[in-house]
Amino acid sequence: PAGRARADGGGDAPDRRDPASLRIGGVTPFSSTDFPGRLAAVLFLQGCPWRCGYCHNPHLRESEGDVRHDYASFVGWLATRTGLLDAVVFSGGEPTAQAALGEAMQDIRSRGFAIGLHTGGAYPRRLAQVLPLVDWVGLDVKAPMPAYGAVTGVSGSGIAANASVRLVVGSGVAHEVRTTVHFDLTPPEALVALADELAAIGVRRWILQPFRPTGCAEERLVAAAPSGERVDEALLARLRERVPGVEVRGP
């Protein structure tokens, strides 16, 4: 019948590059921490190809997961926030997993909002396509390249991540690189090796975020998280010899 979307994506089903096809698993209507210096709404998009054990949004991993918000309703609400919000941040999941990301960014920019992106760099080709539309990137780097698969559960993932770091650094877009620190996955010597990799690419600002057990579905990592272990001053000094702008964020 006319007007019914067919299972094969025909009929009136939205094109996968139409912003209406964006699969949104969650929305934070107001954040002062997800885009430095800007007040932002955050869209959490469904889908991620990686299976990092410390992920605190595991419900967003599946691309066809629980889509809780539709794009049209979001932009309708966003129109009421003009003058109150500065930006929209696309997070996830892995936002670059969705083909409609660039079109959604263009649409929201046209409404007068800056664009932020949180990404792990799993899809460097799509990242390259959307970078010209982005005002700030928070890029999650998991581990030294040879150890990437042990964190993400996907062999070869370090190649994509390395390419994405190079893209972001070379783009001139404002950004920060950040790494979650759990010494079972990223012990001190791994962090030093990662600092060498990042320095060789030209990274100058690097945020270390201590592991947070909240939302982590992997009990092994929660149980192994040491109560008193921190990135100490001696380790920080070694890292800053390589990447001057290293900071520890959080407890």
Regions from the PLM with identified roles:
Residues F44, S91-G92:
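A secondary-structure boundary/capping signal
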Residues T33-H69:
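Canonical Radical SAM [4Fe-4S] cluster-binding loop centered on the CxxxCxxC motif
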Residues P58-V89:
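Conserved alpha-helical substructure of the radical SAM core
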Residues P1-G37, G170, L185-P251:
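Auxiliary Fe-S-binding modules of radical SAM enzymes
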Residues R16-T28, G47, L60-R61, H69, ...:
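SEC14/CRAL-TRIO lipid-binding/transfer domains and related phosphoinositide-recognition modules
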Residues V75-A87, T96-A223:
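Conserved AdoMet/S-adenosylmethionine-binding subsite of the radical SAM
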Residues S63-V67, G93-E94, A114-L117:
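Short, flexible loop segments at the rims of nucleotide/cofactor-binding pockets, characterized by
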